[in-house]
Swiss-Prot record:
Lineage: Eukaryota, Fungi, Dikarya, Ascomycota, Taphrinomycotina
UniProt xrefs under InterPro entries: MFS (IPR011701), MFS_trans_sf (IPR036259)
GO MF annotation, one: transmembrane transporter activity
Bilayer topology term: Multi-pass membrane protein
Protein name, UniProt field: Uncharacterized transporter C417.10
GO process terms (BP): dipeptide transmembrane transport
Homology family: Belongs to the major facilitator superfamily. Allantoate permease family.
Organism expressing this protein natively: Schizosaccharomyces pombe (strain 972 / ATCC 24843) (Fission yeast)
Record's subcellular location: Endoplasmic reticulum; Golgi apparatus; Membrane
Gene3D superfamilies per record: MFS general substrate transporter like domains
Length: 508
C-alpha cells in the first residue's frame, strides 16, 4: 500500500491521481496532532441520530449561542455606521478635516484590521475561543468610548486600534459556526448573523437621529454615539464570556450525552471542531491551494465598493440627493431594513438553492444593478433605490464565509484561509474610501463607476471557484468508485486537511 507524504502533496496536489491506492500519511496522532473532538469520537457510534433528538439539540444551540453571535455582530457594525453618521453631525468641522482627511478615517480602520488579522486569528486558535473573543470585544469597547477625542491625529490613531481589535470578530464567528453546525446548516446561520449588520444600521440611524435633534446635550452628539456603542460592546464582551463555551465539550447547557451527539452530528462535515496547535504544513497547503486565491481576489473586488459606500453613504445622500442632515440620518432606517430582511431571505433561499456559487452570483447581480442606478440614474429617488439595492451585496461574502467553514478542513488551514480572505476584505476596504476624491465631490462619479466595475469583475470569480471544486469532487468520486480510497474510522477528527482526507467533498 503506497502512502502520500504531505511534502509530496504540496509540491503537486494533483499527484494523488497517479497512486494505485490512496492512504494519506497523516503523521501526528498525538493529543497535539488530533482534533479536540477525537477522544469523544472514539466513544461515539456511527448510528443515525433520531431526527427529533437532533432537532432538540439544534434548538438548544440556536437558543443559547446563536443570539449572542447575532447581537455581537450587530453592535460591531454600529462602529462602521457611526463614522458615517458622525461626519454629518459635526465630526469633520470639530476635527478640522480637509481634503482626503475624512477618507483616511475609513482607511485607517482597515489598516489596523489588515495588520492584526493574522495575529488575531492565531490567538483565536491558540487560546480558548470565547475567552479570546471576550478580551477583544471589551478592549474594542473601551477604545470606542475613547474616540470622542479633540484632535484628528488622536482620532486616526484610535481608528487603527479599533480595526485591530475588530479583526477577531469575523474569523471567530466563522470558527464558532463550524464548531457547532453541520455544513447544511451553516449557510442559513451565517446569513442570519451577518444580517444583524442591518439591525445595527437601524439602531445607529435611530440613535443618531435622536441625538441630532437634541439641543441640550452634555457633549457633541457624534461623540455620544461612539460612547454608547462602546459601552454596549463592553457589556456584550462579558455576555460572550458567560454564555458561549470555548467548544461543545465544555458547553454548560449540554448534558454529557448531548456533547457526544454534537460529535456525531459533525462527522458529516468531514472535519472536527478545533486544534490549538499551529501546523506549518497546513499553512503551506493553504498558500498553494488555488481556491485560497480565487476567494482572495473575490474579496478584494467585493469590498472596494463596500469600503467606499460604508464611509461615504451619508455624504452621497446629503450631497447628491437633496436631503438635509436629519432626513439623511433617517434614510439609514430603510437601508438597514433592506440589509436585514434581504440577507435573512437570502439565507432561507439557500435551503432551496443548494449551489452556493449561484447564490453569490444572484446577490452580486443585484448589487451591480444597484451600483448602476447609483452611478447613471438621474432622479434622486432612483439613485436612492440603487443605494438600497447595494445593501444585499454582503450576500456574496456570506457565501464565502460559509465556504470557508465547510470547505477548508484542518484547523490551521481553516484559520489561514479565513485570514487571507479577510486580508482581501481589508485591502478592498482600504482602497474603497480612497476612490472618493474631494475634488470629485459631491457627485463622486469616478468612485461610483469603480463600484460598477468591481461588481462586474467579481462575477467572474464565482464560476472559477465552482469549476475547481466540481472538478476535484468528480475526480475523488472516480477514485472511490475504483476502490482507490481507503476509509479511515474517525478520520474527520484527526485534524486532516481537505487535501489529506480524500473522503472529503467540497460544497459547491
Amino acid at each position: 500500500m503506497s502512502s502520500i507524504s504531505i511534502d509530496e502533496k504540496l509540491k503537486d496536489p494533483e499527484s494523488v491521481q497517479n497512486k494505485e491506492i490512496l492512504d494519506v500519511d497523516v503523521g501526528d496522532l498525538s493529543p497535539k496532532g488530533v482534533d479536540a473532538a477525537f477522544n469523544y469520537a472514539l466513544d461515539v457510534d456511527y448510528d443515525e441520530i433520531d431526527p427529533e433528538t437532533e432537532r432538540r439539540l439544534v434548538r438548544k444551540i440556536d437558543c443559547t449561542i446563536f443570539p449572542v453571535m447575532c447581537l455581537v455582530y450587530c453592535i460591531q457594525f454600529l462602529d462602521k455606521t457611526s463614522n458615517s453618521y458622525a461626519v454629518i453631525m459635526g465630526l469633520k468641522e470639530d476635527l478640522k478635516m480637509e481634503g482626503q482627511m475624512y477618507s483616511w478615517s475609513g482607511t485607517a480602520f482597515y489598516l489596523g484590521y489588515l495588520v492584526f488579522e493574522f495575529p488575531a486569528s492565531l490567538l483565536l486558535q491558540r487560546f480558548p475561543l470565547s475567552k479570546t473573543l471576550c478580551v477583544f470585544l471589551v478592549i474594542w469597547g473601551f477604545l470606542l468610548c475613547m474616540t470622542s477625542v479633540a484632535n484628528y491625529p488622536g482620532f486616526i490613531a484610535l481608528r487603527v486600534l479599533l480595526g485591530m481589535m475588530e479583526s477577531a470578530a469575523s474569523p471567530g464567528f466563522i470558527l464558532l459556526t463550524a464548531q457547532w453546525y453541520k455544513r447544511s446548516e451553516q449557510q442559513l446561520r451565517t446569513s442570519v448573523w451577518v444580517a444583524f449588520n442591518g439591525l445595527g444600521q437601524i439602531l445607529g440611524s435611530c440613535m443618531a437621529y435622536g441625538l441630532a435633534k437634541r439641543t441640550s446635550l452634555p457633549m457633541r452628539g457624534w461623540k455620544l454615539i461612539f460612547i454608547i456603542c462602546g459601552v454596549l460592546a463592553i457589556f456584550l464582551g462579558f455576555v460572550i464570556l458567560a454564555v458561549v463555551p470555548d467548544n461543545p465539550f465544555k458547553a454548560w447547557f449540554l448534558t454529557e450525552e448531548d456533547r457526544k451527539l454534537v460529535v456525531k452530528r459533525l462527522r458529516a462535515n468531514k472535519q472536527g471542531v478545533g486544534n490549538n496547535h499551529f501546523k506549518l504544513y497546513q499553512f503551506k497547503e493553504t498558500m498553494l491551494d488555488i481556491r485560497t486565491w480565487i476567494m482572495f481576489v473575490s474579496s478584494v473586488l467585493l469590498n472596494i465598493p463596500n469600503g467606499g459606500i460604508g464611509t461615504f453613504s451619508s455624504l452621497l445622500i446629503k450631497g447628491t440627493m437633496g436631503y438635509d442632515t436629519l432626513q439623511t440620518l433617517l434614510m439609514g432606517l430603510p437601508a438597514g431594513a433592506c440589509e436585514f430582511g434581504g440577507l435573512i431571505a437570502f439565507g432561507f433561499l439557500s435551503l432551496f438553492i443548494h449551489k452556493r456559487m449561484v447564490l453569490a452570483t444572484i446577490t452580486t447581480c443585484i448589487a451591480l444593478i444597484g451600483s448602476c442606478l447609483l452611478s447613471f440614474a438621474g432622479p434622486p429617488r432612483a439613485q436612492l433605490a440603487g443605494y438600497y439595492l447595494l445593501m444585499v451585496s454582503p450576500g456574496a461574502m456570506i457565501v464565502m464565509f460559509a465556504i470557508i467553514s465547510s470547505n477548508a478542513s484542518g484547523y490551521t488551514k481553516k484559520v489561514t484561509v479565513g485570514v487571507i480572505y479577510l486580508i482581501g476584505y481589508c485591502v478592498g476596504n482600504l482602497i474603497g474610501p480612497q476612490t472618493f476624491k474631494a475634488a470629485d465631490a459631491p457627485e463622486y462619479m469616478p468612485a461610483k463607476n469603480t463600484m460598477v466595475g468591481c461588481y462586474a469583475a467579481t462575477l467572474v470569480t464565482f464560476p472559477a471557484l465552482y469549476y475547481v471544486n466540481w472538478r476535484e469532487n468528480k475526480r475523488r468520486d472516480q477514485l472511490a468508485a475504483e476502490g482507490k480510497i481507503e476509509h479511515r474510522p474517525n478520520a474527520e477528527f484527526e485534524d486532516l486537511t481537505d487535501f489529506e482526507n480524500l473522503d472529503f467533498r467540497y460544497t459547491l
